[in-house]
């Protein structure tokens, strides 16, 4: 059964805007099963946010995309652009593009003065990106990178799901 699921959960199955899609829900199940931390929060698990009080956040914020000409709902609401976030982290990010809010996190890794989430060193940041299936170059991405980001994230999400299936 597991290998059959792997065949179905290819990156192209994540080309959807439906949070109810089987592929997206399998990705969330994988994050829960693998005990993944939520984005920018060491110690706050994805499972905590799903069961208690997390927000579904757009990695490239919806208003940022709209202001930059991506105003098609199915384009900005791609599940590859979704991540569960702690409510306070979501509010702190606001409509900032990834290049801005990840620059803040990188700065706090150097200064140790926490202003966004609780990640305080770069190694921890890159591990956190990996467990959330986010490409490492997100730290410098802007609107021109959105389509390539979606493609790369779908591949990383599918890879995490495959790891989940192999561990079942």
Feature annotation, model-predicted:
Residues 22-55, 60, 86:
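Short cysteine-rich loop/turn motifs with clustered Cys
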Residues 1-6:
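Short, small-residue-biased leader/transition segments that mark boundaries at the very start
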């Amino acid at each position: 059964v597991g290998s059959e699921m792997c065949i179905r959960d290819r990156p192209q199955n994540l080309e959807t805007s439906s949070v109810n899609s089987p592929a997206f829900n399998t990705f969330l199940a994988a994050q829960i099963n693998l005990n993944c931390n939520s984005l920018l929060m060491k110690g706050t698990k994805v499972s905590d946010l799903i069961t208690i009080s997390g927000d579904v956040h757009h990695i490239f914020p919806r208003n940022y995309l709209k202001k930059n000409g991506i105003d098609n709902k199915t384009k900005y609401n791609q599940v590859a652009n979704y991540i569960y976030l702690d409510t306070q982290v979501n509010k702190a990010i606001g409509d900032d593009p990834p290049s801005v809010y990840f620059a803040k996190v990188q700065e706090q890794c150097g200064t140790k003065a926490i202003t966004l989430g609780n990640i305080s060193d770069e190694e921890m940041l890159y591990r956190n990106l990996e467990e959330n299936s986010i490409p490492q170059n997100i730290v410098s991405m802007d609107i021109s990178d959105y389509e390539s980001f979606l493609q790369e994230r779908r591949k990383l999400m599918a890879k995490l799901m495959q790891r989940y299936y192999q561990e079942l």
